[in-house]
Amino acid sequence: MATASVAFKSREDHRKKLELEEARKAGLAPAEVDEDGKEINPHIPEYMSKAPWYLKSEQPSLKHQKNWKIEPEPKKIWYDRGKKIYQAEQYRKGACINCGAMTHSSKACMDRPRKIGAKYTNMNIAADEKIESFELDYDGKRDRWNGYDTSTYRHVVDRYDAKEEARKKYLKEQQLKKLEEKNNNENGDDATSDGEEDLDDLRVDEAKVDESRQMDFAKVEKRVRTTGGGSTGTVRNLRIREDTAKYLLNLDVNSAHYDPKTRSMREDPLPDADPNEKFYLGDNQYRNSGQALEFKQINIHSCEAFDKGHDMHMQAAPSQAELLYKNFKVAKEKLKTQTKDTIMEKYGNAATEGEIPMELLLGQSERQIEYDRAGRIMKGQEVIIPKSKYEEDVHANNHTSVWGSWWKDHQWGYKCCQQTIRNSYCTGSAGIEAAEASIDLMKANIARKEASKESPKKVEEKKMATWGTDIPEDLELNEEALANALKKEDLSRREEKDERKRKYNVNYTNDVTSEEMEAYRMKRVHHEDPMRNFPG
């Protein structure tokens, strides 16, 4: 079947070959064996199992189907850390100036910087490191365990063994302690009730279960109570589903909504039921209980702190945000306590049983204070002078007085130059004179403006007796000028009718005289005049 091409076969040989193949496929005859002694699957098609003629294979085999380009599995090779290859006795040209090794430069030297390098002392020449260069295949480059020393895992095993020993020792001490307490109780009271013994057995069972859970996935044998009457078995993390699903607590369609995708029911399905008898109050009960409320407060605090300019983000750095929130709460409580103590110290506490001091009740004390003629305290309580928030006796920018020595128009300033701008340069008496001159000029401008408002000038409007106005009665016209204006109006009307004769360059003024206006009125056609067509 898996042989190469052979010579011509007779019909009988060909029939026997087909029968043998059918028998091998049916399992009636043993499968063909290759040169390595491995069976060849009889169901492999002939075009796959038959070797090409140029291979000249005499025995059946499937080696021609194997990929001959596949390289053997690469070895787990890695760098020999700290391996040295050659130890020189004298400094060589091109070596490291600091240690004298040829395999690296002085910038990449990992030895301690020497006060005088090996290049100049020619002593204590460091050995050359073993530099390896090998190419890894695709899987070798991505093998995270390549080069891992398995002997280092022994430290992890030792650490876990130590923890296990400490845990067993602690449990043994606790057990001995309980036995001692039990012996002491037996000496005092010999009899114990059956119910207490059952409770002790349950506690022991639960302790065993808790102990087994801490072990690495050990088998847990726990008593299982079933609905059929009680049976025991070996189980692990088994939950008895005897409780009712939350979406079956209330079958009313208009009750609390259940989202099957997220398996959440925010509202209470039984709001009218007794709270003491309910074990489920809706998913909203978890939003304001446990660590959910604290998580919400941390989110609010981080957002407010970020708005105020602090580099704080709950999602980017949750541990930092939680730590800063704890520090903030501690500082807040400390400030609140300090404020409370200050108020108590100043005003007292009316809720206490102690008597209120007489100084607070009567507003006076028995302390004797002596004053001199000027009113200064000579003996007794000294007056505490309030400390200024500004630096005292510091004259900056050529000033001869401090800031706050001048007050005018509800503004502080410098007395030497009477400037109200802080950190300004001193201008001296010239600045004072310039400020007074500007103030005088401003006052003069204000007075002039007020005077102009009180007595405004009457502007006589010049009314023209021409366009759009009635002809005044006292208007006097020159008859000669009026005749010339009439002629000029007739000429302009003729030019309007024949625009070809109009000249390009026109020399005239736009000033309209009274005579020209009168001529325009006389010549124009009054469409609204009912007597315009009446023969005169």
Curated annotation (Swiss-Prot):
One of its GO terms (molecular function) is zinc ion binding. A motif (Nuclear localization signal) lies at residues 486-493. One of its GO terms (cellular component) is nucleus. Disruption phenotype: Reduced hypocotyls elongation when grown in continuous white, red, far-red and blue light conditions associated with a depression of PIF4 peak amplitude. Increased accumulation of spliced RVE8a form, but reduced production of spliced RVE8b form. Plants lacking both SMP2 and PHYB have short hypocotyls. Reduced organ size due to lower cell number and reduced fertility. Cell proliferation is arrested precociously in organ primordia. It comes from the Eukaryota. It is found in: Nucleus. Residues 187-200 have a biased composition (Acidic residues). A zinc finger (CCHC-type) spans 96-109. Residues 1-42, 176-201, 488-507 are annotated as: Disordered. Keywords: Metal-binding, mRNA processing, mRNA splicing, Nucleus, Phosphoprotein, Spliceosome, Zinc, Zinc-finger. Pfam families: Slu7. The modification Phosphoserine is found at residue 193. One of its GO terms (biological process) is response to light stimulus. The keyword Phosphoprotein applies. The keyword Nucleotide-binding does not apply. Residues 9-25, 488-501 have a biased composition (Basic and acidic residues). PANTHER family: PRE-MRNA-SPLICING FACTOR SLU7 (PTHR12942:SF2), STEP II SPLICING FACTOR SLU7 (PTHR12942). Interacts with PHYB in photobodies under red light. Belongs to the SLU7 family. Participates in the second catalytic step of pre-mRNA splicing, when the free hydroxyl group of exon I attacks the 3'-splice site to generate spliced mRNA and the excised lariat intron. Splicing factor acting as a negative regulator of seedling photomorphogenesis by antagonizing PHYB signaling to promote light-induced hypocotyl elongation. Prevents the accumulation of functionally spliced RVE8a form, a circadian clock regulator mediating the transcriptional activation of clock genes containing evening elements (EE), but promotes PIF4 expression to fine-tune hypocotyl elongation in the light. This is Pre-mRNA-splicing factor SLU7-B. It comes from Arabidopsis thaliana (Mouse-ear cress). The lineage of its organism: Eukaryota, Viridiplantae, Streptophyta, Embryophyta, Tracheophyta.
